[in-house]
UniProtKB/Swiss-Prot annotation:
GO molecular function terms attached to this record: toxin activity
A single Gene Ontology CC term: extracellular region
Domain of life according to the entry: Bacteria
Keyword Flavoprotein among record annotations: no
Keyword Signal assigned: yes
Keywords, sorted A to Z: Signal, Toxin, Virulence
Record-stated family: Belongs to the staphylococcal/streptococcal toxin family.
Additional facts recorded: Binds to major histocompatibility complex class II beta chain.
Known function: Mitogenic for human peripheral blood lymphocytes.
Protein name: Exotoxin type G
């Protein structure tokens, strides 16, 4: 009798553990599908455009282009205090991921705004290292190309994710990757981390994923030392 009870307990534990693994696997697949959909997007990318007006937490920009016979605007939502750095009439560069396309003549983004600087056609390149389960590989210098003296973490993040999606299929439902991080290192030994799997986000939507860019984190290209990407399969 005791043997039968023990067997039942063991089988129950095994079944419960297996169910938890299956549930976690499905959750990861859902997360990957949502990330693939969210980041498979064409960014708002404009140079030398003008700020129409600013509010407490938004920057409204006239792109001088037309969509649906109307002037196309970009409305950037930012954290409190960010708009103090900009005024009406400022010339800016925009690189942001739209989370809302309604109305059709306004693209809504979070952050993604830097003061315009005339960098010409010179592309900046960065040293990068990919670490997969402890195995390091130096990445080609053209993985991330940026033409601005200043850029946002949002732009760098998207270009890294695009590279990883195209080269390593990190967000494919059946891919072996379970987690990953991007570390952007500056010459004063500071590191800025981005969770490439957005595991802190409760809602699997563009709006939720892209809110992380509200702080409009800006880097000067001359400050960058290198970047590291860590991917894990366990």
């Amino acid at each position: 009798m005791k043997t039968n009870i023990l067997t039942i307990i063991i089988l129950s534990c095994v079944f419960s553990y297996g169910s938890q693994l299956a549930y976690a696997d499905e959750n990861l697949k859902d997360l990957k599908r949502s990330l693939r959909f969210a980041y498979n997007i064409t960014p708002c990318d404009y140079e030398n455009v003008e700020i129409a007006f600013v509010t407490t937490n938004s920057i409204h920009i006239n792109t001088k282009q037309k969509r649906s016979e109307c002037i196309l605007y970009v409305d950037s939502i930012v954290s409190l205090g960010i708009t103090d750095q900009f005024i009406k009439g400022d010339k800016v560069d925009v690189f942001g991921l739209p989370y809302n396309f309604s109305p059709p003549y306004v693209d809504n983004i979070y952050g993604g705004i830097v003061k315009h600087s005339n960098q010409g056609n010179k592309s900046l390149q960065f040293v990068g290292i990919l670490n997969q389960d402890g195995k390091e590989t130096y990445l080609p210098s053209e993985v991330v190309r940026i033409k601005k003296k200043q850029f946002t973490l949002q732009e760098f993040d998207l270009k890294i994710r695009k590279f990883l999606m195209e080269k390593y299929n990190i967000y494919d439902s059946e891919s072996r990757y379970t987690s990953g991080s991007l570390f952007l290192a500056t010459k004063d030994s500071k590191h800025y981390e981005v969770d490439l799997f957005n595991k802190d986000d409760k809602l699997l939507s563009r709006d939720s994923f892209f809110k992380r860019y509200k702080d409009n984190k800006i880097f000067n290209s001359e400050e960058i030392s290198h970047f590291d990407i860590y991917l894990k399969t366990y």
